[in-house]
From Swiss-Prot:
Keyword Membrane: no
Enzyme Commission number, as recorded: 3.6.1.7
Protein name (record): Acylphosphatase
Root EC class: hydrolase
Segments passing through the bilayer: none
Catalytic residues in the record: 21, 39
Highest taxon, organism lineage: Bacteria
Organism: Legionella pneumophila (strain Paris)
Residue span(s) of domain Acylphosphatase-like: 6-91
Signal peptide residue numbers: none
Keywords: Hydrolase
Gene name linked to the record: acyP
Catalytically driven reaction(s): an acyl phosphate + H2O = a carboxylate + phosphate + H(+)
PANTHER family on file: ACYLPHOSPHATASE
Similarity section: Belongs to the acylphosphatase family.
Length: 91
């Protein structure tokens, strides 16, 4: 059985104004991941995601590249305990 957990990621580079959050939401929904993504004032994107461990690994791999017009310089990750979210939201 696959373990459920959450992760918080901070993504820096050209990640705002390139549909990063909307693309993350689309993929998260396909992978049945819940949580949220938001822009930060310093130009980074913060993502909080919860789901099955194997799906989170796939999602994290995508976060390290982002959508077509993005340029990801750094993507940090912190694993966190499971939290039950209903959907994936763009904040």
């Amino acid at each position: 059985m696959t373990k459920e957990l959450c992760m918080r990621c901070y993504i820096s580079g050209r990640v705002q104004g390139v549909w990063f959050r909307a693309s993350a939401k689309k993929l998260a929904e396909q992978l049945m991941i819940s949580g949220w993504a938001r822009n930060l004032a310093d130009g980074r994107v913060e993502v909080f995601a919860c789901g099955k461990e194997d799906k989170l690994e796939e999602f994290y791999t995508w976060l390290q590249k982002g959508p077509l017009n993005a340029r990801v310089d750094v993507c940090t990750r912190e694993n966190l305990p499971w939290k039950d979210y209903i959907s994936f939201d763009v904040l």
